[in-house]
């Protein structure tokens, strides 16, 4: 479904001030409804194989050009800090990344409230041990196009020695689906200033591009530091992938124990 077809009216075009051709589609595109997809997580056994995989994947990565035409299929690629290191990125460039990215989620468990049952020692493998070097994500608006894109990605891995696939996780949703807790997906997607489209009804004012894309001013009016050299960071972004076990019963019990009426439970849940 293109954004212009979504409930709430047609999307109005606006000025483009970011380099859409150099930004991955997944940074700006809304997931279509319905959507189908797969995350593939892999490890580089040696730098040469990792670089060869990136060379093979590069022609298949979609840019954010005309991202508002969201009803299609796109492929994106992300590299972890350990992945950049495994590729042989120079040490001075690696040190130019923020500490939070260099350390990874497991090392920042306290800041992320990952304790008790959420402690990294309980995480499903391969999460939290630094083995994930690359993530390849496929999104599509139809099962046939999803399968075709997935087959194209798997073909790039081919018989490439030196790259090990650690996990392939399928995902998706239909237009009326809600998550395990009863919430509707995609309601928190912000509009980004300079991306080429005005906000949809209810989105509020556009957020400065620098809050999401490196190389542009953020809400404070300054451009945040980027990795060195500039080509390594400009028009990129930071992303996280986490796999949760939804404890719906515990969540509903918390609502009942802390709210007296159904209306209060709804407010607390919101």
Language-model features: locations:
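Long, low-complexity, Ser/Thr/Gly/Pro-rich intrinsically disordered segments that act as flexible linkers
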Residues: 1-270
């Amino acid at each position: 479904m293109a954004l212009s077809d979504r409930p709430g009216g047609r999307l109005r075009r606006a000025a483009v001030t970011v380099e859409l051709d150099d930004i991955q589609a997944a940074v700006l595109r809304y997931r279509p409804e319905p959507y189908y997809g797969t995350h593939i997580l892999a490890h580089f056994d040696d730098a040469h194989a990792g670089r060869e995989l990136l060379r093979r994947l590069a022609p298949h990565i979609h840019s954010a050009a005309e991202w508002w035409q969201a009803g299609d299929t796109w492929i994106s690629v992300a590299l972890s800090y350990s992945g950049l290191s495994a590729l042989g990125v120079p040490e001075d460039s690696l040190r130019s990344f923020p500490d939070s990215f260099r350390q990874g989620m497991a090392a920042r468990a306290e800041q992320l409230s990952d304790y008790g049952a959420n402690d990294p020692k309980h995480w499903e493998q391969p999460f939290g041990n630094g083995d994930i070097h690359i993530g390849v994500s496929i999104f599509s608006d139809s099962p046939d196009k999803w399968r075709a894109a997935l087959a194209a990605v798997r073909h790039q891995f081919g018989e490439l020695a030196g790259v090990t696939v650690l996990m392939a996780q399928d995902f998706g949703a239909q237009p009326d689906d809600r998550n395990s807790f009863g919430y509707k997906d995609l309601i928190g997607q912000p509009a980004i200033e300079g991306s080429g489209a005005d906000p949809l009804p209810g989105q509020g004012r556009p957020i400065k591009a620098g809050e999401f894309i490196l190389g542009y001013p953020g809400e404070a009016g300054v451009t945040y530091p980027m990795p060195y050299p500039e080509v390594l960071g400009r028009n990129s972004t930071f992303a996280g992938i986490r796999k949760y076990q939804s404890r719906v019963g515990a969540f509903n019990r918390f609502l009942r124990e802390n709210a007296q009426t159904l209306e209060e439970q709804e407010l607390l849940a919101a």
